[in-house]
Amino acid sequence: THKQFPNYKRYEIEYEGRPLVMETGKLAELCNSAVLVSYGETTVLVTCTASARPKDGVDYFPLSVDFNEKLYAVGRIPGSFNRREGRPSLNAVLASRLIDRPMRPLFPSDLRNDVIIACEVLSVDRDCSPEITAMIGASAAVSISDVPFNGPIAGIVLGWDGEKYLFNPTQEQRKTNRMITTIAATHKKIVMIESEADQVPDDVM
């Protein structure tokens, strides 16, 4: 592997009881950077591509985050007449925003180059969130690229079942949770909190 891919690197840690593996230097080498992230059985390929020159006539940062979750990732065939994938699902759109929201403020405010972060979900383990996997991969991909970025960030899902907190809860645990909160942070501060919950005490929140 090292002879065929001299830039290949692999890192593995345990993240809330499950293996988190990041690999780079093997896929999508024409992008500014690419990271293959696996969390449990969930695998996401995240690529970062930036234009060489600033975009003319814009007064904002043209960042685009695309989260693509195809049916093959869960072992299914599209049920439409022509067996083709449809438009991005609501979940995919929300996942794209979930990744965009904590990362966008960490780029320089005067950056005007087009930057596209593409998260391609290759396989899904329903107990290991593809959204969190993609968020970690997106942060890693931008961090190792030549795009200026004041990261990295990490994300975690925090659940509460009425008695105790659960970190990155499984799909079964989520069904009974009274609160599901997604948190993204740098090593210094929290940059995003998104929550859906029943009525819960203030001290729990």
Region roles according to the model:
Residues 3, 11-12, 19, 57, ...:
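Catalytic cores of large soluble enzymes that bind and process phosphate-bearing ligands
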Residues 32-116, 121-123, 128:
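Glycine-rich, flexible beta-strand/loop modules in the N-terminal catalytic cores of phosphate-handling
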Residues 146-205:
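Mobile "lid/hinge" segments at catalytic clefts and subdomain interfaces of large enzymes
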Residues 102, 133-145:
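Stable alpha-helical structural segments in soluble proteins, enriched in small hydrophobic residues
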Residues 13, 23-26, 35-39, 44-52, ...:
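Short beta-strand elements
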